[in-house]
Design a protein with these regions (language model features):
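Conserved polymerase palm-domain catalytic core
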Residues: 61-62, 136-247, 251-266, 287
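Right-hand nucleic-acid polymerase module
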Residues: 2, 99, 201-209, 261, ...
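Short, conserved non-catalytic motifs in the polymerase core
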Residues: 3, 38-45, 70-96, 112-124, ...
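A common structural junction motif
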Residues: 268-277
Length: 342
């Protein structure tokens, strides 16, 4: 049975999932997934030395509800001219625990997501999103004359904990599952003072329980799911045919710019009233037939697609780095061989 709220259909609420999370086979699989590419981590090697012992320890934490999110390590990463604050949890027990949770709840989250959202979803991603945008632009030219591009200001830092927890409660009725989701969501507030002031109007109480950590595995799915009601509102209430979302990066196509400007006003209201988000001031409304759509690292035109300049530059930098690294390794091997021969 489905529940209809705000013009959008919601699937039935699911229960009896928590015991699947702490099932030993699920924990073993979580460890296998979490350790991919991290075999050199001391924590991974520690668990591999006696997996039954350590995974039983995690299982007991989950059964007895003594699990608490560990302290985050914070570091900064520069990407495309932006400095991002990254939050990192210990491999054990936290990252294994988050994998165990997501292996169980991921299918239910994906069921509620529309087909035109592409971030943090298996078998979708950038190329699937690009293909959908390209198909719209090239096969329905009259209804794709104009594009609205928006994204949320400081998105991860602006996610409201209470709203996110209520969204999970619309889907799950398992109190034990909701307990551990709440525990992870409330483990840290990542919003800066300027984010809080920007989000909340003067006549509202500022909620300090805001912001989820970039770098948390659960944050990717929570960040995607936070938008799900909005996605359904766009499709089922506003009946927007060409709406595409990659996390908080949104592209909407329409016949006229007037339609898009009106829609932008309504989106602004929805963001503030229902999600406590703010649209970045650099939103764009433009004709697609003149400049193409800059999205997901590409520029999409009616008759062709180009790589974005910055994407090309990034690829060149990586190629130079790997080439120089490979040359250094060859040189070291050559010197080693010469020393051995001599």
């Amino acid at each position: 049975m489905t529940e209809r709220i705000g013009g959008c259909n919601y699937m039935k609420r699911y229960g009896h999932l928590y015991e699947k999370i702490y099932d030993m086979e699920n924990l073993k699989l979580a460890h296998q997934h979490a350790k991919k590419g991290k075999g050199w981590y001391a924590e991974v090697q520690m668990i591999d030395s006696d997996p039954d012992k350590y995974l039983k320890e995690l299982q007991d934490m989950l059964i007895n509800k003594t699990y608490h999110t560990s302290e985050y390590e914070v570091f900064y990463k520069n990407e495309h001219g932006k400095t991002r604050k990254i939050y990192k949890l210990p491999y054990f027990p936290d990252r294994v625990a988050q994998w165990a949770i997501l292996q169980v709840i991921e299918p239910y989250l994906i069921k509620h997501l529309i087909s035109d959202t592409f971030s943090a979803i298996p078998d979708r991603g950038i190329h699937k999103g690009l293909s959908r945008v390209k198909k719209a632009v090239q096969h329905d030219v009259p209804n794709c004359q104009y594009c609205l591009k928006i994204d949320a200001r400081h998105y991860y830092q602006s996610v409201n904990h209470d709203i996110l927890k209520q969204k999970y409660r619309k889907m799950f009725k398992d109190n034990d599952l909701l307990w551990i989701l709440d525990e992870i969501i409330d483990s840290i507030n990542t919003a800066e003072d300027e984010d809080l002031v920007s989000i909340y109007l003067l006549d509202e109480d500022i909620d300090p329980n805001t912001g989820i950590p970039i770098g948390n595995y659960l944050s990717q799915y929570s960040g995607n799911y936070y938008f799900s009601d909005f996605d359904h509102w766009m499709k089922e209430v506003k009946h927007v045919k060409y709406y595409f979302r990659y996390m908080d990066d949104i592209v909407i196509l329409a016949r006229t710019k007037e339609e898009l400007h009106q829609l932008l006003k309504e989106i602004n209201e929805y963001f503030h009233n229902n999600m406590k988000l703010e649209i970045k001031k650099n939103y764009q409304v433009f004709p697609t037939y003149i400049r193409g759509i800059d999205y997901l690292g590409y520029r999409v035109f009616v008759s062709y697609v180009l790589l974005r300049k910055q994407t090309c530059k990034d690829m060149k930098k990586k190629m130079v780095f790997f080439a120089s690294s490979f040359c250094r390794k060859l040189q070291n091997i050559f010197v080693g061989c010469c020393n051995y021969i001599l």
